[in-house]
Swiss-Prot record:
EC annotation from Swiss-Prot or TrEMBL: 2.7.4.8
Family under the similarity heading: Belongs to the guanylate kinase family.
Residue numbers binding ATP: 12-19
CDD domains: GMPK (cd00071)
SMART domains noted in UniProt: GuKc
UniProt function note: Essential for recycling GMP and indirectly, cGMP.
Reaction(s) the record says it catalyses: GMP + ATP = GDP + ADP
Organism: Streptococcus pneumoniae (strain ATCC BAA-255 / R6)
Descriptive protein name: Guanylate kinase
Tagged with keyword DNA repair: no
Length: 208
């Protein structure tokens, strides 16, 4: 039976570039892990593909899945739901395949309670001015919504201590490489691999 895969939880403030860094990781990486597509009730943006960038669902459909207990995590953010389908994640991990979750900070904290041995990576902007420029540059939100996102970002950055790693997105390729290095190192963490060496360990404490 294959070892259970590694659950990688990747999050950060809105506009920090999570999706861009994630795409860079998957396009340039030889690591064998699977991207878990999140589900959301927000409007589909130009260029986004249902089932690739997100599963786009109505609010009613999403709330029904919550009632059925079919979400690993979910959160409501600026009037929209975001979440991770549970069945897909467990089936993939059980096959020994690493699963990469790109989710909101609220959702990441829910996952930490349920899967404390997951790897939690927080992507940060260089500073708040740069974050605001990125949000404005997207051209998808009103000034009021952008202001809400900046205030929310401050709250989320304050939760960075709940994560295992913090990586600044000052340049996409560098940020992606840093994330890949973290994932590679986690595969050799003693707590994760010690089970393979049980037969080499003494059966009982030795005395002199």
């Amino acid at each position: 039976m294959a070892d259970r895969g590694l659950l990688i939880v990747f999050s950060g403030p809105s506009g920090v570039g999570k999706g861009t860094v994630r795409r860079e990781i998957f396009e340039s990486s030889e690591n064998q892990f699977q991207y878990s597509v999140s589900m959301t009730t927000r409007a589909q943006r130009p260029g986004e593909v249902d089932g690739v960038d997100y599963f786009f669902r109505t609010r009613e459909e999403f709330e029904e899945l919550i009632r059925q207990g079919q979400m690993l995590e979910y959160a409501e953010y600026v009037g929209n739901y975001y979440g991770t389908p549970l069945t897909y994640v467990n089936e993939t991990l059980d096959k020994g395949i690493d699963v990469f979750l790109e989710i909101e900070v609220q959702g990441a904290l829910q996952v930490k309670k349920k899967v404390p041995d997951a790897v939690f990576i927080f992507l940060t902007p260089p500073d708040l001015d740069e974050l605001q420029d990125r949000l404005v540059g997207r051209g998808t939100d009103s000034a009021e919504v952008i202001a809400q996102r900046i205030e929310k970002a401050k709250e989320e950055i304050a939760l960075m201590r709940e994560y295992d790693y913090a990586i600044v997105n000052d340049q996409v390729s560098l940020a992606a490489e840093r994330v890949k290095c973290v994932i590679e190192a986690e595969h050799f963490c003693v707590d994760r691999v010690i089970g393979h060496y049980q037969e080499m360990l003494p059966k009982s404490p030795t005395t002199r």
